[in-house]
Amino acid sequence: MAAKKKKSTTRSGTNLESLNLYTFFLDRALQSYAIRDALKAMGARVEMHRDHFKEDADDVDWLPTIAGKEWVILSKDQFNWMEREAIRNAHGRAFLLVQGSLTGREQASIICGALRHMLRILNNTPAPFIAKIHRTSHVLIMPKEYRPNR
């Protein structure tokens, strides 16, 4: 009798092999060295806002540039409607960490915990999209008409 083929314990599309296909851009609100270093340690390519733009650059000005490079935007801003439209019009992809008042290490832990889900979305969802990363590392794509209550 033939031996049973061992089943993979990793769900299809959720391993980290595709991580090197993407460049993650940490915007000015999330440009922590702890996040950068944690993502790089996992094999990600990471760029930081401060290395490409002035500190006071308006989001609507740099968003199309980053989307045009096909970099994945990481932020903790819940973009206003003009910024969300700029992402969508430029066919951008953005993940927003929606939990405030966290240290860089805590943010890094949440984002790294969400990477498999983020990669699943990146590999299977065409741009443009905006997704939220929650404190539990759960990731949820926001509907196009989403408007946060403020």
Regions found by a protein language model. Give the residues of each.
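Conserved BB-loop
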Residues: 45-59
